[in-house]
């Protein structure tokens, strides 16, 4: 059975842009993610799926610029939940080297920050 594996790293950084579109919000982030290096990624938020308008789906796509000079790309998706001006995300990604990860991420729209924890998937 597949389960969440060990904690790989924590990450923190900034939102570099936010666009409110007719189909949803698009957020670009730049974070420092330890062994993954500098990670640049785009989050695209779908419409809410609950009556309260507090949760919905999202996709993620990005690239890691590792300290050793290598790069990895990744794609994935998950869910988000609003908490005031903050948004909690949980997503699964697949990296170009075959790694699968699970992340819990916190966005603060007022502070324009992104932070969270990345776990391996077994």
Residue ranges of predicted features:
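Beta-strand-enriched cores of mature, soluble protein domains
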Residues: 1-122
């Amino acid at each position: 059975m597949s389960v969440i594996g060990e904690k790989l790293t924590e990450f923190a950084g900034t939102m570099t842009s936010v666009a409110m579109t007719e189909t949803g919000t698009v957020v670009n982030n730049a974070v420092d993610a330890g062994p993954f290096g500098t990670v640049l990624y785009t989050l695209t938020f779908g419409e809410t799926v609950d009556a309260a308008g507090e949760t919905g789906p999202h996709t993620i796509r990005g690239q890691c610029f590792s300290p050793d000079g290598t790069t990895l790309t990744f794609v994935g998706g998950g869910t988000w939940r609003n908490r005031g001006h903050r948004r909690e995300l949980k997503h699964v990604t697949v990296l170009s080297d075959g790694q699968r990860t699970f992340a819990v991420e916190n966005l603060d729209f007022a502070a324009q920050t992104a932070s969270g924890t990345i776990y391996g998937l077994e």
